[in-house]
Amino acid sequence: MQIKRFEAGEMQEALRQVKEAMGPEAIILSTKTVSLPSSRSGYPKRKVIEVVAAIDRHHAPCSGRHGSNPSSNSVRSHRPRKKDGPLLQRLLSTGLTPEFVHGLIKEMPALEKECGGSSFSEALKNFLHWKVMESLDVMGPVTEGMKIWVLIGPTGVGKTTTLAKLAAQFRLKAQKKITLITLDTYRIGAVDQLRTYADILDMPLEIASRPDDLKKVIERHMDQDLFLIDTVGRSPNDSKHLEDLKEYLTVHPQLETHLLLSATTKDRDLAHTVERFSCVPVKSYIFTKLDETEDYTPLFNQLLRTRKPLSYLTNGQKVPEDIELASKEKVANLFLNTLHWN
């Protein structure tokens, strides 16, 4: 990471310097007005705008020009300073992965050098927000073309309700042609629940009891924009279920698998679930039940461990309202709320 301080008579000029020296990917850590001695004896101090900005070194431009008081501050490996102890313990106490925490602590000398004093608290919050955003990936808006989405996950994560929310969102907002498919003929009422949604949204519902059935259903509805496939919820420890699931996922080359993870799951159990479902190709995560907890650290840790993209967030039972496309900004805000830093 590079941190630099820029000084200018006006904010617009300071921001222009930031963009020229560090590129459009730079993030502003702090801004303040400072008084500098006049270059001429006896004249009053002059006021300037001071902006401290940061950039990941991979994004830094090759320009040789710098701000008015440049400092590369390339981060060197070092042991945590004694003064960083309280911050280190605060971050570790949240359950964050030690690797991520120690990576943050390594940046503190550079951050403190350029943002010391009253602006340090603001800079630290902005820095954490930026590092969280830099550490995760999101799937982004759905592109054009036929999509076949399979929702998988353990019992109780909300697969059927999430499928209904997605169906309603794409039908009502994007006017997509959608076919619902369920593989869940085991759970009492599962088909009836989906049939209710299908009738309300005026879209077909198909049942596929075997992989060959799923293949035939898709072939019958090739004019559709989107297939949404509900699966049986089983324990991640059920190896037989996972092997059966793998057979369904080979019936069409455009199948995309989305793993649902509940925000109420403990960190260790979440890691175990993801490890067990790694036997199938997962396109993205969907985080559910965000409204049922205030601690999102386990979810963020999972994004750090696997670097899988996040596609959607759900935060309630209402269909279709309680679902949204995941964004880096949203996830960063959720996590900082966990730290009580917002």
Residue ranges and their predicted role:
Residues 1-138, 144-145:
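Non-catalytic terminal/linker segments enriched in charged/polar, low-complexity residues
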Residues 9-12, 21, 78, 87-91, ...:
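NTP-binding/hydrolysis catalytic cores, primarily Walker-type P-loop NTPases
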Residues 149-151:
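Hydrophobic anchor at the beta1->P-loop junction of P-loop NTPases
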Residues 154-155, 178-189, 196-214, 218-241:
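Switch II (G3) loop of P-loop NTPases
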Residues 159:
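Conserved lysine of the Walker
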Residues 162, 166, 193:
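Hydrophobic positions on the alpha1 helix immediately C-terminal to the Walker A/P-loop
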Residues 177-179, 254-261, 278-293, 297-315, ...:
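Conserved beta-strand/loop subsegment of P-loop NTPase cores
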Residues 219-227, 240-265:
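Inter-motif core of Ras-like GTPase G domains
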